[in-house]
UniProtKB/Swiss-Prot annotation:
Transport protein for sugar phosphate uptake. It holds the Pfam family MFS_1. It comes from Chlamydia trachomatis serovar D (strain ATCC VR-885 / DSM 19411 / UW-3/Cx). The keyword Transmembrane applies. Keywords: Cell membrane, Membrane, Sugar transport, Transmembrane, Transmembrane helix, Transport. Coiled coil: none annotated. The chain crosses the membrane at residues 34-54, 70-90, 113-133, 161-181, 185-205, 257-277, 302-322, 331-351, 363-383, 394-414, 421-441. It is a multi-pass membrane protein. One of its GO terms (biological process) is phosphate ion transmembrane transport. This is Probable hexose phosphate transport protein.
Length: 456
């Protein structure tokens, strides 16, 4: 047995606990423990992912870099992260998330520290690329855990609550880096998140576990007595339990449940354009406000924090509405929220002649509200429209496209802003939001049942 297998192989299923009351008690305990652990873990992944973003204005001042050079560094992370998200999705579906997520977080912390020790573009690109690769180890194990510990009828709500970790991390890191820059300079803004994440990685090793069956608990569908079938599966509890025992081969995951799935292709291309908008607003809006409205770094970063906070509320509402109003279908909410995103971007650009920070902050809050709804539900829909044992790969596949979109928000949009000004920048964002809306329309009625009919 090689070292990789020894560390990452999923633990074997053990004999199921026979006492129903003990099963209920254990399920309640482990669901909460695993949830808060992966929630906090992903908050800290954001610390090491976005530290550079909020150090950018200081890097321009201290080292004399221009927007295009900084865009290259940013795009490097998004490219390596996007590729890793797909590759790591395949790996994580056959790995123990306890170690997979934790080791990824530890290495991102180390990468941030080495970035802070560097001063040249080649070294920045190297360490930020390594960081991007191991950032891809954060999301797929969470998708695996969410599909194994939470059932179909509740998953939209739990997934949306977990997804607020993006926003909490995104809202905290501008404050942390802003304070760190004021007291220690931009290097301290890289060191501090890095050290915190190394510590958190070891905490995840202690807190996380794999599937319910590895702890002697029944599959979630059997426990909740739901016919929570995935495409190509029967819906009886016995078959579901038997299926839960069987790990899929890499070939089955890729070719049977992911690459031949038409809904994943619509979701993936939509994800590309949603992420262009998301990362453009996240990475460039502070610089836009500083350059065009002469806001202080703290005030501009506060506006970006409002973008993240708006996203938190948007995700929670989108997940709840898709569970209740849409009866588990994610397509309708994706369409409605994308339309709201298009209108809110127009609103922010319409305030360009008003130098009032709370107006800009309000529009960024609204953009975040409408953007993070579909951003969250793309991954959820991908996991649900695939196989339970392919959830990490399916969501990683959409994530692969997403972070190519994010890479487009780096150098290409930086070049647009440099050559055509902020007007060209906003035109590009509006075009991306419109294309995403069009791509969501065919998925309005997408469901496991419609995929089953298509595939048989």
């Amino acid at each position: 047995m090689n070292l990789w297998t020894k560390i990452f192989q999923p633990p074997c299923h053990i004999k199921e606990i026979s006492d129903p009351e003990l099963v209920k008690k254990q399920y309640k305990y482990w669901r909460m423990r695993i949830f808060y652990s992966m929630f906090l873990g992903y908050v800290f992944f954001y610390f090491t992912r976005k530290s550079f973003t909020f150090a950018m204005p200081t890097l321009i001042a201290d080292l004399g870099f221009d927007k295009a050079q900084l865009g290259i560094i940013g795009s490097t992370l998004y490219i390596t992260y996007g590729i890793s998200k797909f590759v790591s999705g395949v790996m994580s579906d056959q790995s123990n998330p306890r170690y997979f997520m934790a080791i990824g977080l530890i290495i991102t912390g180390i990468s941030n520290i080495f970035f802070g020790l560097s001063s040249t573009i080649p070294l920045f690109v190297l360490f930020w690329g390594i960081n991007g690769w191991f950032q891809g180890w954060g999301w797929p194990p969470c998708a695996r855990l969410l599909t194994h510990w939470y059932s179909k009828s509740e998953r939209g709500t739990w997934w949306s609550v977990w997804s607020t970790s993006h926003n909490i991390g995104g809202a905290l890191i501008p404050v942390l880096t802003g304070v760190a820059i004021d007291y220690t300079g931009w290097r301290g803004a890289m060191f501090i998140p890095g050290i915190i994440c190394i510590i958190m990685g070891f905490i995840l090793i202690d807190r996380l576990r794999d599937t319910p069956q590895s702890l002697g608990l029944p599959a979630i569908e059997k426990f909740r007595k739901e016919e929570d079938a995935h495409p190509h599966e029967e819906t009886t509890a016995d078959i579901l339990e038997e299926e839960a025992e069987r790990e899929l081969s890499t070939k089955e995951i890729l070719f049977t449940y992911v690459l031949s799935n038409k809904w994943l292709w619509f979701l993936s291309f939509a994800s590309f354009f949603i992420y262009v908008v998301r990362m453009a607003v996240n990475d460039w809006s502070a610089l836009y406000l500083i350059e065009t409205k002469d806001y202080s770094t703290v005030k501009a970063n506060l506006c970006v924090s409002l973008f993240e906070i708006g996203g938190l509320f948007g995700m929670l509402l989108a997940g709840w509405l898709s569970d209740t109003i849409s009866k588990g279908k994610r397509g309708p909410m994706n369409v409605v929220f994308s339309l709201g995103l298009l209108v809110s971007i127009l609103g922010l650009w319409g305030t360009r002649d008003y130098f009032v920070w709370w107006i800009d902050g309000t529009f960024l809050f609204i953009i975040g509200f409408f953007l993070f709804g579909p951003q969250m539900m793309i991954g959820l829909a991908a996991a649900e429209l695939s196989h339970k044992k392919a959830a990490g790969t399916a969501s990683g596949f959409t994530g692969w496209f997403a972070y190519f979109g994010a890479a487009f928000a780096g150098y290409p949009l930086g070049k647009v802003a440099q050559d055509w000004g902020w007007h060209g920048f906003f035109v590009a964002l509006l075009a991306c939001a419109l294309i995403a809306l069009i791509l969501f329309l065919p998925t309005w009625n997408a469901s496991e049942q419609s995929l089953r009919k298509h595939s048989h």
